A protein has these predicted regions:
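Long, positively charged leader/targeting segments at protein N-termini
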Residues: 1-334
Length: 335
């Protein structure tokens, strides 16, 4: 996809360098070689690889059909997909999540290369056998950018390509799920709070399941001793805090998550609305922007509700003491 976009793609230089470093034909396994793998562990690995190809291609086809202008089917063939998947496999590493699901991680080469921030145009070049990439000016901690545009195909795919819901209307559950990092060693206890798909944010703020999970991971040693008693009902944490100290930590996590999410969008609501008022978007591009805007609005409504409930639960004085630097006044939902 990024290779087809040419110089307009901010990721094209990185993708090209992957292909240059790992020629596709170097990853091909011949039929004869496969036969020799029979009854060996490597045969299972190859079978998993084949299954990944089938699953990935089926998901890609669904995406092409949903966004035909962004992802033109004639640009993406099964052979190209298999080639790209082979490149990713050759330049990535596999991790297994706490729930047993395997994921393959491709570290963006942009973070491994020397950067030149003096240019505002996408550019990659070799200087003394070193890749140098020109990127836009940025502040420390900002995501590096190598191109300009009102929307990005890669961004759209990254946010919505693996979603089961492609609609500008609210989905059936209208929830932004919250995933705990793998280093949280309370997966079984968190499971007592409710199904993973219910742990998240809705327009009504943090779900009861999310509040329960956050209260679990925010508990101090004394509170944990209490919760380990046989008669303690973990589900009661959906509706009641453990202590003032722990509840402050819970709301700190809620605000940090929602503000990070809202700040992660590369375009403002005004930008998206401007795009939607114009006539430059194809139908599927318009749908993608609406999906993004809907998610953003859901997050903003959730933030407003969390702020209201936090002030009510902790009291105005305590709430302002801990969170006035984040939100000195109530967030106004103008959407």
């Amino acid at each position: 996809m990024e290779r087809e976009k040419g110089v307009a793609s901010r990721y094209r230089p990185f993708v090209d360098s992957l292909y240059e470093r790992t020629p596709a034909n170097s990853t091909v396994v011949s039929k004869k070689a496969r036969e020799r793998l029979a009854e060996h562990h490597a045969e299972k690995v190859m079978r998993r690889y084949d299954e990944d190809i089938v699953r990935g291609w089926n998901a890609a086809v669904r995406t092409f059909r949903t966004f035909p202008t962004i992802f033109r089917a004639q640009d993406f063939t099964r052979s190209k997909f298999e080639e790209a998947l082979a490149i990713v496999r050759a330049n990535s590493f596999e991790v297994t999540r706490a729930d047993g699901v395997r994921e393959r991680v491709l570290v963006p080469l942009a973070h491994l290369l020397v950067h030149d921030t003096s240019s505002s145009v996408p550019c990659v070049k070799m200087v003394d056998d070193t890749f140098v990439i020109n990127v836009d000016e940025h502040r420390a901690g900002d995501e590096l950018s190598c191109s300009h545009g009102e929307y990005s195909d890669a961004e759209t795919f990254a946010r919505f390509g693996t979603s089961a819901v492609y609609s500008e209307e609210n989905n059936a559950r209208d929830v932004i799920t919250f995933t705990f990092p793998d280093e949280v060693h309370l997966k079984e206890e968190i499971g007592s709070c409710g199904p993973a798909e219910d742990i998240g944010f809705t327009r009504d703020g943090a779900s009861a399941e999310l509040m329960c999970a956050l209260r679990l991971v925010s508990a101090n040693a004394t509170e944990w001793s209490e919760m380990r008693k046989p008669n303690f009902d973990l589900q009661s944490l959906k509706n009641r805090p453990l202590s003032e100290e722990s509840e402050v930590a819970v709301y700190d996590a809620l605000f940090a998550t929602l503000t990070d999410l809202l700040n992660s969008y590369p375009y403002s609501d005004v930008d998206d609305e401007h795009l939607l008022r114009g006539d430059r978007l194809a139908d599927d591009e318009r749908r993608a922007v609406k999906i993004r805007l809907r998610e953003k609005r859901s997050a903003l409504r959730a933030l407003n509700t969390v702020q209201y409930r936090g002030r009510k639960a902790l009291g105005g004085v305590l709430f302002d003491k801990h969170f006035s630097h984040i939100m000195p006044t109530r967030v106004k939902d103008e959407l």
